[in-house]
Amino acid sequence: MARVCQVTGKAPMVGNNVSHANNKTKRRFLPNLQNRRFFVESENRWVSLRVSNAGLRLIDKKGIDSVLADLRARGEV
């Protein structure tokens, strides 16, 4: 399963660890993904999504029905 948020599309990015001596080594910055279930009242069922914390905030702001409509338009869910 890819480490990608289903709502925002956030994915791992690449950067550097930087030591005190300014040595740089490659590392990955992973999105803060959570597996969450949301109850959709209009459909009277639960929907499971793998969302980042930013995606959870977006769902709180716009509502699960609006977010699901966007996902279905993109063909995600």
Curated annotation (Swiss-Prot):
> Which Gene Ontology cellular component terms are annotated?
cytosolic large ribosomal subunit
| Pfam families recorded | Ribosomal_L28 (PF00830)
**Keywords recorded for this protein, A-Z:** Ribonucleoprotein, Ribosomal protein
Source superkingdom: Bacteria
What Gene Ontology terms describe what this protein does at the molecular function level?
structural constituent of ribosome
Q: Name one GO biological process term.
A: translation
Q: Which family does it belong to?
A: Belongs to the bacterial ribosomal protein bL28 family.
Query: What is the protein's given name?
Result: Large ribosomal subunit protein bL28
Q: Which organism is it from?
A: Cupriavidus necator (strain ATCC 17699 / DSM 428 / KCTC 22496 / NCIMB 10442 / H16 / Stanier 337) (Ralstonia eutropha)
